[in-house]
Amino acid sequence: MAVGVFDSGLGGLTVLDAVQRRLPEVPFVYFGDNAHAPYGVRDADDIFHLTCAATERLWAEGCDLVILACNTASAAALKRMQETWIPKDKRVLGVFVPLIEALTERQWGDNSPPREVAVKHVALFATPATVASRAFQRELAFRAIGVDVEAQPCGGVVDAIEQGDEILAEALVRSHVEALKRRMPHPQAAILGCTHYPLMEPIFQEALGPEVSVYSQANLVAESLADYLARKPEFAGDGTESKFLTTGDPRSVSNKATQFLRRRITFEAA
């Protein structure tokens, strides 16, 4: 059995790290489409085709279940994939829904009508493509009423993180938080709607202030996956070993990933 984890670059490693800790007995195959990163500035068609190609590569590795550990792909491609493309014997899950369930205090599969929730003012930090898709607002509207969402497209942050430039990433995060607070001075909650952003979570929290609850995805997705596999064990595919694949330069990506997670990670060419 093996589960696939896909991201346009290295951000999905934050999700991989959490799911590996939660499910140590499950092998995971990670696919980073580093050659085409970042996805956040691409159009929806482009993101759809790249995400389908990556998903097929993970199916070929024996992963019947693939997690799109990339909010841009989850937002811009997943709905279309589920409606038009994914065969019956495979599953592809996004990273948005576990986050929204946590925010709206719902259990998985609770399809009751939308209702009032405690949090009324939510700041969303995400890539330009995720913000443009409005997928977060759409999914939230299925579950909650009366929630005001102010979205901030965070241009440049993913690039800075992928390049290992922490000083630039921190400066960009602070400027994006400032820009959002001009439009929504007192958010109650903030969503880090990109799997790269947990690496900058302390900076987001500091810039937003201690009274703002910051939601980041990795642990929420790990719990959701554990729950899913307990209910549907048949989707733990027949792959047997963990591996890391990249469309980029394996040596360069391995070095950045090792820096990223602070443990040795070795990628091979996809």
UniProtKB/Swiss-Prot annotation:
The record places the active site at C70, C194
Q: In which pathway does it act?
A: Cell wall biogenesis; peptidoglycan biosynthesis
An example Pfam family from this entry, by short name, is Asp_Glu_race
**GO molecular function terms attached to this record:** glutamate racemase activity
Provide the E.C. number(s) assigned to this enzyme: 5.1.1.3
Question: Which top EC class applies here?
Answer: isomerase
Any idea what job this protein has? Provides the (R)-glutamate required for cell wall biosynthesis.
Name the family the entry cites. Answer: Belongs to the aspartate/glutamate racemases family.
Q: What is the protein name stated in its UniProt record? A: Glutamate racemase
Organism of origin = Cereibacter sphaeroides (strain ATCC 17023 / DSM 158 / JCM 6121 / CCUG 31486 / LMG 2827 / NBRC 12203 / NCIMB 8253 / ATH 2.4.1.)
